[in-house]
Amino acid sequence: MTAASLDPTAFSLDAASLAARLDAVFDQALRERRLVGAVAIVARHGEILYRRAQGLADREAGRPMREDTLFRLASVTKPIVALAVLRLVARGELALDAPVTRWLPEFRPRLADGSEPLVTIHHLLTHTSGLGYWLLEGAGSVYDRLGISDGIDLRDFDLDENLRRLASAPLSFAPGSGWQYSLALDVLGAVVERATGQPLAAAVDALVAQPLGMRDCGFVSAEPERFAVPYHDGQPEPVRMRDGIEVPLPEGHGAAVRFAPSRVFEPGAYPSGGAGMYGSADDVLRALEAIRANPGFLPETLADAARRDQAGVGAETRGPGWGFGYLSAVLDDPAAAGTPQHAGTLQWGGVYGHSWFVDRALGLSVLLLTNTAYEGMSGPLTIALRDAVYAR
């Protein structure tokens, strides 16, 4: 399915027909045991057309998924923390072109030749700094030897120590000369803490969660009974996760992820700005709607810049046709991407089994939070859900 036949001025969504299509998609995924449970929301121009919980939050206990179930957000954290950064930019407390050393004077990563390049807030927001991720490199890599955390696993050191280790790894390229998914939002989390004088959780709450009415999100929770139990893909059915499990990523996505489901309940776990938040589907939708509509949340010029491709289509951040802005991947060429979404669509996901997109041309915000990695992030379910939304 491509975008060629979808005229934004003629596009319409009937809630009953949409629900029938989406329910069929979830019924098939559950029947085939590719999915344990999910919460999905589709909104158009701020009106919720579909919001349903599917399957089980805890398969072994038989606990059903609820619309207010809490999820470990993984990289769905990133756009929320990026919004906090942009709010500080709007206030003049941060600057996009300023070096990160203005707030983190000790963070001075070098290139392979030993030279120290300028790394800016812009580079970090767009993942063009040259930093990387253990999950991309895997066992035996420099990131592995240095013991750098991705913010998904549980370590016995703090954020400052992780950034010290990260700064000692050579950059993959000169800042601004390439694109690579990275720990940049963890670095920006530390920048937010220094700029505000607050812990990251408090700063994100004040800058983003409270203004948007996100009441069920944070970094450390004391309500384990509200959480979806995480699972990973397996045969004949998904496998319940345990701390320390290493799950290979799908081909083309990287090496593997080291999960620690208990991290979200550990008060001593450092706040990962790239992967450490939890939240409900309603909370995440509020953030997506702020990104889509920007109801005075950011100055319009800054919101436009955040939603515009800053990395270039050559970055292929989700494959051909995709660039990257300050919040997520940005669709430049729907035909090259082979998608019915429109140019300017923003999209990303999370390794615990999440995906979302915002098609601003159609006023669409579409969210899928699941407890099944990686089916809910990049599996057939995500394509089937997308195509069901655009089906005519």
Curated annotation (Swiss-Prot):
Catalytic center residues: S75
Biotechnology: Directed evolutionary mutagenesis has created an enzyme with 40-fold higher stability in organic solvents.
GO cellular component: cytoplasm
Enzyme Commission (EC) number: 3.1.1.-
Enzyme kind, highest EC tier: hydrolase
Reported regulation of activity: Strongly inhibited by eserin, NaF, HgCl2, SDS and Triton X-100.
Keyword line: Cytoplasm, Hydrolase
Thermal dependence: Optimum temperature is 43 degrees Celsius.
Xref: SUPFAM superfamilies: beta-lactamase/transpeptidase-like
Signal sequence annotation: none
Transmembrane segments: none
A single MF term (Gene Ontology): hydrolase activity
Result of altering S75A: Complete loss of esterase activity
Pfam families: Beta-lactamase (PF00144)
InterPro entries on file: Beta-lactam-related (IPR001466), Beta-lactam/transpept-like (IPR012338), Beta-lactam_class-A_AS (IPR023650), Diverse_Enzym_Activities (IPR050789)
pH dependence: Optimum pH is 7.0.
Localization per record: Cytoplasm
Function: Acts on short-chain (C4-C6) fatty acid esters and triglycerides, including tertiary alcohol esters. Activity on p-nitrophenyl esters is generally higher than on o-nitrophenyl esters. Lacks beta-lactamase activity; it hydrolyzes the ester bond of cephalosporin substrates but there is no opening of the beta-lactam ring observed.
Sequence similarity: Belongs to the class-A beta-lactamase family.
Protein name: Esterase EstB
Organism expressing this protein natively: Burkholderia gladioli (Pseudomonas marginata)
